């Protein structure tokens, strides 16, 4: 009887707990929904105040753009509102998650839930008997790090730190729901369906940081390849450089080797050793074989390497080590693996730092290359130096004609092969200084050439064309104050802001700025420094051109609420910049 009464009491307690937990979750859900509805429906007054404080960054007129410090993005008030809403919703969700984890009485496990739920008399607490692990799959091999077999499953909100969840919430509020997509192989409807169903992930600071962390661990092989290429080009590995030149020559004369060699490497360098490790030969006695050297491919790629990386490759388990593993003592193997002075292994944290440093240097080098290319294209196409740009144009044109005529009569396989050999011979550390000294002229000859060049430049005549100029317009708008003859400055805009203007009919402020110093010329143009803003006194002309029927007084065009006058400025066309 006591057992039945205790079971009834526990059941009633569980029912009461589940009832209040459901009510608690409903209250939290209603608070979240109300907060989301408030954040998504701002009032009209807030929109008008935000637009009046920020304005618009680009005028619709093609001849004028205005810049302002607060011209882009949302206002400060809206930004603070979004931050507060994100912080509030994140706190509520974390509180809800913590409460649900406390209410739940049975924890879930990521591996073999059925074994955890079964009751066994032979089990002693958390220590399970062998019957629970007979049907468990073997997930780990010899190289896998040891760790706990069972890990409680937790939600993403519990695993992610509070600041990560808060940043994701804030980004989801500030960034539009559907960002412009890049080109995809799928159709547009498929992409939209994936976005709606959530298959395509949205922008997340947590995901971005996690991807960079994983990428920093995986970039080691790419930097190893970069080191190998540098060693080959600088002749630090002469055998590998000559072998690479021979392979490049074979590819030049038979491009099919470009497909055959990677397949050969995959089959005999990856698949076959993997099969041997998986299914070793069952032998009790092995004939002794003298090791004549390492693999040619490893010599080509890893010779001349630093101590850390070369030690890893040299002391890694080879083909014969796998075959003889059954006849070796376990103590000897473990002792060999613990010899850190031979393996040269670094800690995982140090590897990540090295990869991050290499990624930083790689991105810096990439930026320098991009800037150099843009600078070359800008100097070549902008015709700032007429002589240099003209020479490059005619040189390129003559090269196109010459190569087009000569290409059918040239064996390009020989040309590419000879060019590669000559280039690497030129880069040899011993041959490079001798070649430079052989082709280098004396100092007297160089000074004579510079003197002739100066005389030639002194005799040159530069015929500069007259720059292209035009006038841009902007309207100085005033708003009527309380007194009849009292007008207050409103803003500078490229729109007249008459009663039929779309912005005025929509009760919105026109795009513009509050100071003439913030007005910038159109792209590719610059203000004439010898010209100032000038008032256009010919009001009738530009009023008739626009078909307006409003009263004119002096240089102003009036309507019941606003008056405006036209200002003009001269601009000069610049050279078209390279994008």
From Swiss-Prot:
Low complexity biased stretches: 49-63
Domain of life: Eukaryota
A GO-annotated cellular component: peroxisomal membrane
Topological domain ranges for the Cytoplasmic compartment: 1-243, 414-579
Peroxisomal side, ranges: 265-392
Principal location class: membrane
Entry membrane topology: Multi-pass membrane protein
Keywords tagged on the record: Glycoprotein, Membrane, Peroxisome, Peroxisome biogenesis, Transmembrane, Transmembrane helix
Region (Disordered): 40-70
Subcellular location: Peroxisome membrane
Residues annotated as glycosylated: 361
Keyword rRNA processing assigned: no
UniProt function note: Involved in the regulation of peroxisome number, size and distribution.
Family, as annotated: Belongs to the PEX28-32 family. Peroxin-28 subfamily.
Name of the protein in question: Peroxisomal membrane protein PEX28
